[in-house]
């Protein structure tokens, strides 16, 4: 299955594409816990799917989806209680895994076509919340995520050891109709202790200011 978005093609990957998946998932090898290690990959093939972004015939990014209520969710190392973090049960959520991208395409917004894919898959699977998690040690395109309707919900660890940014968005959000909020707080991205505290108080980061500080609201 292929979908065209501007100059990029998004295509589902299958078992025969395993070398491509392993090429990108090796970026996790430097972390203590790898949620897409070779022994865990079959779980995603069975309960979710891998997708790649192609520039012509060249693969430039890879992501995956996984139903949050699947039995293998815990095997990703995520001990999160989504109901506590998001106010939604796992059965309503579609996990959208880290988006690996080639370094030479740095600065290219792959999130816009990929989020369209995630939304389509959420609709097919009757999920109304997209949950996207990104290793805090890896470069994160906060602005593209915010532009595509995601909010930063928390900084949480995989296997209680590897910190990940946890983003979420409702599938019915209209990103060009964001209401005004009076209770807005600013926090530097580097101040992880303070931003975690704000998230625990119910604040959600939704944008960045000109100095690249996170803007929180609740």
Placement of each model-derived feature along the sequence:
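Short amphipathic alpha-helix that is part of the acyltransferase structural core
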Residues: 1-39, 45-54, 59-60, 179-186
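Conserved acyl-donor/pantetheine-binding loop and adjacent beta-alpha core of acyl/acetyltransferases
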Residues: 61-98
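Conserved acetyl-CoA-binding loop-helix of GNAT-fold acetyltransferases
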Residues: 98-101, 106-122
């Amino acid at each position: 299955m292929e979908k065209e978005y501007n100059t990029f093609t998004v295509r589902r990957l299958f078992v025969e594409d395993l070398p491509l998946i392993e090429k990108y998932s090796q970026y996790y090898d430097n972390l203590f816990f790898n949620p897409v290690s070779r022994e865990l990959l079959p779980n995603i093939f069975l309960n979710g799917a891998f997708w790649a972004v192609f520039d012509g015939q060249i693969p430039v990014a890879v992501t995956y989806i996984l139903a949050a209520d699947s039995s293998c969710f815990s095997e990703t190392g995520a001990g999160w209680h989504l109901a506590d973090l998001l106010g939604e049960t796992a059965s309503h959520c579609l996990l959208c895994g880290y988006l690996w991208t080639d370094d030479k395409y740095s600065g290219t917004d792959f999130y816009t076509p990929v989020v369209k894919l995630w939304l389509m898959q959420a609709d097919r699977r009757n999920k109304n919340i997209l949950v996207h998690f990104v290793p805090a040690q890896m470069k994160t395109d906060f602005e593209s995520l915010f532009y595509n309707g995601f909010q930063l919900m928390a900084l949480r660890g995989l296997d209680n050891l590897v910190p990940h940014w946890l983003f979420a968005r409702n599938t019915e959000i209209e990103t060009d109709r964001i209401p005004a909020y009076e209770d807005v707080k600013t926090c530097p991205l580097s101040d992880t202790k303070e931003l975690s505290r704000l998230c625990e108080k119910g604040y959600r980061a939704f944008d960045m200011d000109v100095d690249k500080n996170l803007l929180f609201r609740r």
